[in-house]
A protein has these predicted regions:
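Short beta-strand/turn micro-motifs composed of small residues
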Residues: 13, 65, 126
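Short, surface-exposed amphipathic charged segments that create phosphate/polyanion-binding patches used
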Residues: 2, 47-50, 137-140
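A Rossmann-like FAD-binding core segment of flavoenzymes
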Residues: 9, 83-179
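Solvent-exposed alpha-helices and their adjacent loops that cap or buttress functional pockets
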Residues: 3, 52-56, 114-118
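Short, structured coil segments at secondary-structure junctions
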Residues: 5, 27-28, 165
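Glycine-rich dinucleotide-binding loop and its adjacent helix/turn
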Residues: 18-111
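Feature captures the FAD/FMN-dependent oxidoreductase FAD-binding
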Residues: 1-23, 176-179
Length: 179
């Protein structure tokens, strides 16, 4: 992980309860976050009563996971990276509107392009291929045709999300150590 040069690491594996990261020393990394506290921060940091930890969303980060929760973390990091670049340039900046429209469409209405912002972006690292990402369920008794349809649906779901939030995916990749 250190040799890959990432600025921040998010572990998104277990939507309801964070699972422990398989490399014990990871918590010594300065910018390591589990998904649930990170998502909680994003949903509440704008509230005047929020008194939890602050998160410094950094560019060129990885999200390690592969399900819907990891996609949410990628989406959040991308929204925050764009917010950091454009909030002062857009009167009444609205991150919720950007989430609903998607980054390209939101920026387009202000004659801006993501490519011009100088953002490296977030990369989702998934240990298997996209067709095995648990974005839709495949019943155990599914016919081969149904299995194939669900796998195509998984790729379509991911591609739609990539188009909307502009993060990257490294499939069949898994960190195995810190150095």
């Amino acid at each position: 992980i250190y040799n890959m040069g990432w600025s921040c690491i998010y572990f998104a594996n277990g939507a309801w309860k964070d699972r422990s990261f398989p490399i014990k020393e990871i918590e010594e990394f300065d910018n390591f976050y589990y998904q649930n506290p990170f998502v909680y921060w994003f949903n509440h940091y704008h509230e005047s009563s929020y008194n939890g930890p602050n998160v410094n969303v950094k560019d060129d980060a990885i999200v390690i996971g592969g399900g819907l929760a990891s996609i949410d973390v990628c989406k959040i990091t991308q929204l925050e990276l764009v917010r950091q670049k454009v909030e002062s340039k857009i009167e009444n900046f609205d991150i919720i509107e950007m989430e609903h429209k998607g980054i390209p469409k939101y920026l387009e209405q202000y004659d801006m392009k993501y490519e011009d912002l100088g953002i490296k972006g977030t990369t989702l690292v998934y240990r298997r291929n996209i067709e095995n990402m648990p974005l839709t369920t495949i019943p155990e008794d599914a016919s081969p045709e149904m299995v194939e349809k669900r796998k195509l649906a998984r790729r379509k779901i991911l591609n739609n999300t990539l188009d909307k939030f502009l993060f990257k995916v490294a499939e069949c990749t898994q960190p195995v150590g810190l150095s």
